[in-house]
């Protein structure tokens, strides 16, 4: 049996798959006490099933996405060590940023020592400005992290309560600005993510579940839950990835469609082309900043069923913030869910309270509760439709999209919009009509994210670095390094070695799958030249087991 759990800002969903069928599902409200929500969802989904029958648990969450979209995280200060090159004006990240002298070259050799006094000044200034979270990032720190470690050690010595993140621990790829953003967001979200992981582990333990536990990454692959605390930002689009895989599993093989997952806090958009989710070639983008996170081409729009709706003068405005449940369920403010209740498009909550909420918006403008509800719903529909149109201009620039157009021998946008999530039934028909497309709401749409998590193939990664001149290789995920005495070590040998380590990690985490096809995420080769002679090579290889789903779920709940 497999369990899929999706922890959203509004609801926590769980599904139990038994021999390829959806045996049970549950949807409960996400409470402040996350542990109680997880236990309630597990109890409803398992319905007396013994925990020792569970073979695997996969989670997804919009927790990190919602934190960032709503900007509900503590500010993060930056200490950057960029070395020579770009003007410092290029390093603007809308937060307190201190640049100190020091530099490593691309081989990891120190070319400019740290200036201790300027380091001390930056640390003191950040503390004086009230920063309790600090990201320390140096260019080429993935090749030599000594400068980052020195600054971080001094920070922790002076201010033991300060949360410090270092760039080399977050991302091994080169590209300094992306590593800065990735490290900054990791620092901003770590505390709440660790609370999430602790709650999950406690809930599973209380229900006697001792199976391997994974969490969905932004690219639709998985990560062992204990390992995910090292890089919480990898789960930044975990929720959107889950809804995409859920739609992939709930629609016929080979379908092309736009995915619209309308939750309580956000609406997630994605694209499936001929049965395969579209991958973002440049990585996850947050507030127009690119990160090192490999992700599906998704976007989280800050509008959902629980978004605050307010009258400002003669206008009704939807804010990108959630203050709690809808007014009809005891919440403090009117929301789109209240509008749906008034229009008879949902049965959630108390109808009288929903009418009261819409009347508070509409009466000063001379509108009836029904007219105000229509106005609110149209605002939601227009916002989401406009974001889909905007996303199409980005999707159409993706290399994979262009290849799909060539293979399909046609240049037109997908004509099917698949709605999932709690708000899909109320909005998706009008959104599809606005786009001139056909609306589809598949079976199990309200718990599609949990299904997407449950059917996700477990994946593992290996990041291999080989330096034939210095005579060593290392496996980043295992913290392993070993001597290598083959000066003629080839790229193919490096790929074979990475695949071998994938097999070792699969055994370690109890994955009963053969490592045959390997997905190459990154392969880079650098020649070392001295006195016009090649003296060695550096290989950076990043591979993972293939992403995908176990199969497609039919209307009867069985996997086909």
State what each model feature region is.
Residues 1-560:
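N-terminally biased helix-coil "hinge/interface" segments that flank
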């Amino acid at each position: 049996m497999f369990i899929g759990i999706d922890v959203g800002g509004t609801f926590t969903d769980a599904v139990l798959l038994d021999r390829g069928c959806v045996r049970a599902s549950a949807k409960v409200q996400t409470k402040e006490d996350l542990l109680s929500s997880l236990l309630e969802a597990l109890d409803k989904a398992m319905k007396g099933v013994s925990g020792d029958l569970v073979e695997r648990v996969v989670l997804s969450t919009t927790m990190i996405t919602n934190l960032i979209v709503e900007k509900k995280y503590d500010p993060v200060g930056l200490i950057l060590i960029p070395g020579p090159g770009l003007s410092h004006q290029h390093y603007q990240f809308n937060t307190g940023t201190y640049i100190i002298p020091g530099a490593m070259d691309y081989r990891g050799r120190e070319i400019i020592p740290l200036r201790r006094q300027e380091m001390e000044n930056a640390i003191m200034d950040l503390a004086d400005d009230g920063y309790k979270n600090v990201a320390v990032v140096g260019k080429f720190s993935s090749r030599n992290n000594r400068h980052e470690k020195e600054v971080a050690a001094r920070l922790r010595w002076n201010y033991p309560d300060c949360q410090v993140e270092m760039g080399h621990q977050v991302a091994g790829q080169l590209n300094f600005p992306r590593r800065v953003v990735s490290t900054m967001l990791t620092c901003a979200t770590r505390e709440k993510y660790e609370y999430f992981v602790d709650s999950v582990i406690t809930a599973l333990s209380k229900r006697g579940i001792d199976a391997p536990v994974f969490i969905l990454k932004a690219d639709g692959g998985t990560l062992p839950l204990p390992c995910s605390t090292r890089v919480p930002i990898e789960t930044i689009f975990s929720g959107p990835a889950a809804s995409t895989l859920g739609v992939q599993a709930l629609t016929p093989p080979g379908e092309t469609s736009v995915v619209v997952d309308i939750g309580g806090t956000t609406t997630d958009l994605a694209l499936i082309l001929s049965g395969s989710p579209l991958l973002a070639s440049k990585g996850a983008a947050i507030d127009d900043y690119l990160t090192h996170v490999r992700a599906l081409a998704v976007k989280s729009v800050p509008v959902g069923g629980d978004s605050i709706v307010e009258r400002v003068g003669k206008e009704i405005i939807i804010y990108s913030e959630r203050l709690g449940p809808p007014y009809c369920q005891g919440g403090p403010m009117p929301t789109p869910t209240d509008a749906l209740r008034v229009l008879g498009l949902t049965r959630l909550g108390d109808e009288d309270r929903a009418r009261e909420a819409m009347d508070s918006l509409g009466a000063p403008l001379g509108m009836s509760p029904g007219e105000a509800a229509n106005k609110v719903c149209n605002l939601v529909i227009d916002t989401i439709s406009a974001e889909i149109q905007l996303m199409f201009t980005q999707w159409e620039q993706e290399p994979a999209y262009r290849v799909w157009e060539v293979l399909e021998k046609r240049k037109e946008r997908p004509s099917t919009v698949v709605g999932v999530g709690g708000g899909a039934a109320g909005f998706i028909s009008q959104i599809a009509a606005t786009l001139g497309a056909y609306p589809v709401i598949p079976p199990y749409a309200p718990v599609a994210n949990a299904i997407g998590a449950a059917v996700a193939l477990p994946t593992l990664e290996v990041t291999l670095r080989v330096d034939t001149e210095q005579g060593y290789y290392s496996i980043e995920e295992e913290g392993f390094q070993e001597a290598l005495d083959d000066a003629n070590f080839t790229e193919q040998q490096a790929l074979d070695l990475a695949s071998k380590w994938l097999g070792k990690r699969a055994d370690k985490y109890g994955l009963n799958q053969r490592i045959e096809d390997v997905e190459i995420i990154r392969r880079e080769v650098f020649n070392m030249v001295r006195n016009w002679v090649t003296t060695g090579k550096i290989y950076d290889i990043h591979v993972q087991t293939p992403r995908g789903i176990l199969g497609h779920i039919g209307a009867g709940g069985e996997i086909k």
